[in-house]
């Protein structure tokens, strides 16, 4: 679909440009207007409004849905930075509601309970840019085809264990690098294996990068975690439970922002890592049974 074909719903150029504005920054999960203010004061480029952080969603179980509109509107009213909110995978009406609430970005999120196990949301139908998760390049490309303006490597949300985030960002960047060395014939085969259009695969092979920004998420809990994600090739970082489940949220939030900005300077990362109090307790991903691995939601 060309930009002119969906000019009434927002072109891909505009949506991707809005996502590009967040590059190099930290996006923080918040569950109250007060937390949103802390995130903004710490230097977050955006906040994700939700009723429960992923650690609580994981601990409490049950069906996790879109947040209450009153909460979302209260957070929007509290801060000047962009506000994101989550919709369930495939739940296009939740996305319609979020767009009506004037959120700045919609995250079609595996952290919430999927509403459709076959179809993701057709994101071309919306003016609001979408964020979508991916564990590998094929998954990322399928979301881009559907209209996603930002990809985040999934990691394993709500654990405080950065190992899955490391695995997913490494896999995506390695698969992109592999495309750049392929011949045209090999790219045709790769496109088939990735279940993506040849034209998109060829574009990535030529540029060596996705056509949208690539953030990372899931388990980032310390300044060093954030800096490592940036050094591994992320354009920015999502931080969920790691801040407001820690001993000193204000200080940790500011430290993670600074470590993200100065990710290539170990002396800065060392300095901001001092005196942060206890990090979130966390869960080892290796101890999670397959049904409890949120990153496996989506296809």
UniProtKB/Swiss-Prot annotation:
Which Enzyme Commission number(s) are listed? 4.3.3.6
Which species is the source of this protein?
A: Leifsonia xyli subsp. xyli (strain CTCB07)
Gene Ontology MF annotations: pyridoxal 5'-phosphate synthase (glutamine hydrolysing) activity
The biological pathway it contributes to is: Cofactor biosynthesis; pyridoxal 5'-phosphate biosynthesis
Q: Which GO terms describe its biological process?
A: amino acid metabolic process; pyridoxal phosphate biosynthetic process; pyridoxine biosynthetic process
The task this protein performs is described as: Catalyzes the formation of pyridoxal 5'-phosphate from ribose 5-phosphate (RBP), glyceraldehyde 3-phosphate (G3P) and ammonia. The ammonia is provided by the PdxT subunit. Can also use ribulose 5-phosphate and dihydroxyacetone phosphate as substrates, resulting from enzyme-catalyzed isomerization of RBP and G3P, respectively.
Q: What is the protein name given in its UniProt record?
A: Pyridoxal 5'-phosphate synthase subunit PdxS
Highest taxon of the lineage: Bacteria
For this chain, the family text in UniProt reads: Belongs to the PdxS/SNZ family.
Q: Which Pfam families does UniProt cross-reference here?
A: SOR_SNZ (PF01680)
Tell me the PROSITE patterns matching this sequence: PDXS_SNZ_1 (PS01235), PDXS_SNZ_2 (PS51129)
- The protein's assembly and partners: In the presence of PdxT, forms a dodecamer of heterodimers.
| Sequence positions that bind D-glyceraldehyde 3-phosphate | 170
Query: Which positions are annotated as binding D-ribose 5-phosphate?
Result: 29, 158, 219, 240-241
**Sections of the chain in a coiled coil:** none
Query: What is catalyzed by this enzyme?
Result: aldehydo-D-ribose 5-phosphate + D-glyceraldehyde 3-phosphate + L-glutamine = pyridoxal 5'-phosphate + L-glutamate + phosphate + 3 H2O + H(+)
Q: Where is the active site?
A: 86 (schiff-base intermediate with d-ribose 5-phosphate)
Give the keywords, sorted.
Lyase, Pyridoxal phosphate, Schiff base
């Amino acid at each position: 679909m060309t930009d002119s074909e969906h000019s009434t719903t927002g072109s891909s150029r505009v949506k991707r440009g809005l996502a590009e504005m967040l590059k190099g920054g930290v996006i923080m999960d918040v569950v109250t207007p007060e937390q949103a203010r802390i995130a903004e004061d710490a230097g977050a480029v955006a906040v994700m409004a939700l009723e429960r952080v992923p650690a609580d969603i994981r601990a409490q179980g049950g069906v996790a849905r879109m947040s209450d509109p009153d909460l979302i509107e209260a957070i929007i009213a509290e801060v000047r930075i962009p506000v994101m909110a989550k919709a369930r995978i495939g739940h296009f009406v939740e996305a319609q509601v979020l767009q009506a609430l004037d959120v700045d970005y919609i995250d079609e999120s595996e952290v919430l309970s999927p509403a459709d196990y076959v179809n993701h949301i057709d994101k071309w139908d919306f003016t609001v840019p979408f964020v979508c998760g991916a564990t590998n390049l094929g998954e990322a490309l399928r979301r881009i085809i559907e209209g996603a303006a930002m990809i985040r490597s999934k990691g394993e949300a709500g654990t405080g264990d950065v190992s899955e985030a490391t695995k997913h960002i490494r896999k995506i960047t390695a698969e992109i690098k592999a495309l750049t060395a392929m011949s045209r014939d090999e790219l045709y085969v790769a496109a088939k294996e990735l279940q993506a259009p040849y034209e998109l695969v060829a574009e990535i092979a030529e540029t060596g990068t996705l056509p949208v920004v690539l953030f990372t998420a899931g388990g980032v809990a310390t300044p060093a975690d954030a800096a490592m994600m940036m050094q591994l090739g992320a354009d920015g970082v999502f931080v969920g439970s790691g801040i407001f489940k820690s001993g000193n949220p204000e200080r940790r939030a500011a430290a993670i922002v600074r470590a993200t900005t100065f990710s290539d300077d170990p002396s800065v990362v060392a300095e901001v890592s001092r005196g942060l109090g206890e990090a979130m307790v966390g869960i080892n991903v290796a101890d999670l049974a397959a049904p409890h691995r949120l990153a496996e939601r989506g296809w």
